Amino acid sequence: MANKIETLSKIQEVGIVAVVRATSIEQAEKITDACIAGGVAAIELTYTVPHADKLIEAMKAKYNSGEIIIGAGTVMDAATARIAILAGAEYIVSPYFDPETVKCCNRYGIPSMPGIYTPTEAVAAMECGADVLKVFPGDIATPSFIKDIHGPIPNAVMMPSGGVDVDNVKDWIKAGAIACGAGSSLIKGAKTGDYDQITETGKLFVQRIKEARAEMAK
């Protein structure tokens, strides 16, 4: 298992985290395969998928080269976080800030990414030891939220999730996001069984993020 710094560095490098929601383990595996084929090397397997811990174990066994980062999402409490970590999850994402979940992650040396939406929540999560602040829901917050938070809290590390698509992902990166979580906009092809569409969308996300960073470096 990679250490916390390595995991966070890889997530920042790829810039996009695939938020995988599915009705079965089989469908989730197909979505994961399609995302990885598109260059999306950070996968968030959510606990809305039935038997998510078994899915995490299976994907960790399948992609064991160290190049793919498998995490758990929609983790609602510390007990679920521990189950996910023991199954092999390399990072934990939650829709809200729960101190006990963050403490559990720190106990195991696993990055935690709790959801936040206000400066108060951001500071509380940071003081508890959260590694990345999940800006959620991103479609309400908009990229300006990150700039506004970075004004008084410049050391906040943030990743939006919800509402991120290929048309606005560059705006999020340029606003200061370490990476972006993409769900329905990335995996919508799964509804019709068009997994090639997921792969192509993944490639486009990766390309747009590279473009944004290149433009920022000028």
Question: Can you describe what each PLM-predicted range is?
Answer:
Residues 112, 143-153, 158:
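CoA-thioester-processing core
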Residues 31, 77-87, 120-128, 145, ...:
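Catalytic cores of alpha/beta
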Residues 45-46, 85-87, 108, 118, ...:
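Glycine/Thr-rich beta-alpha phosphate-binding loop at enzyme active sites
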Residues 1-87, 107, 155, 166, ...:
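Conserved N-terminal beta1-alpha1 strand-loop-helix module at the mouth
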Residues 44, 71, 93, 113, ...:
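Conserved beta-strand positions in the central sheet of alpha/beta enzyme cores
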Residues 80-125:
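Hydrophobic, well-structured mid-protein blocks that either form specific transmembrane helices
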Residues 21-23, 70-78, 94-98, 114-119, ...:
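Glycine-rich beta-to-alpha transition loops that act as phosphate-gripper elements at the mouths
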Residues 95-101, 135-143, 175-198:
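Glycine-rich phosphate-binding active-site loops on the catalytic face of alpha/beta enzymes
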